[in-house]
Amino acid sequence: SVAQGHADIGMASREISPNEKIRFEKSDLRTHSVGLDGVACMVSSEVYQAGVRQLTRREIAGIYMGKIRNWKEVGGPDREIVVIDKERHRGTRHVFMQYIFGNALQRTPGTLLVTGSNNEEQAKIAQSDSAIGMLSFAWMNEQVKAVSLQDQGKEFLPTWEAVQQGQYPIVRKLNFITAGEPKRDIKAFIDFVKGPDGQKIVKESGYIPIGGKD
């Protein structure tokens, strides 16, 4: 809508892709970053309590490709894995799949269920006793647990501190999108969100403030 002139401002939880920059070159799309978010591999609390507290990148890839189908193959209970993916255009999916596969649009034949919003996926994982999915850190709770990532001999803990310190690999910027320089009232709104009061709201919403940084 922004690129087509139907809206003055939009939102995206990922960067504008190279293809989008080419496709909408005349629109001069620009990002205005207002926060940071971590994306974690999440599992049902029953799986977590049964011993699955960490997964390697290769194991996660194997699960989504349908090569690993039972939790017992990765140290968990003897239970079929309910693999939950997101709609392919979702920003959460883009950064997660880019890290796991090196391809933001990777197809995942092991998927049993495709969801849209983080809210929907959180509910599906919580309702199951054997699910895996991908969610923003802001959606972790007692029923939906984040596992740590193992990659090349290193363990990456899914904590806000790790994101802030640059020690967690799946991080994305939360952006406003405008076509060219924003209009005066739109710029005032963006400046507010980047300012102290707006950044307080960002933090209260479960994300990491970044102030005026782009």
Please give the residue ranges for each predicted region.
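Exported/periplasmic ABC-transporter solute-binding proteins
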Residues: 1-214
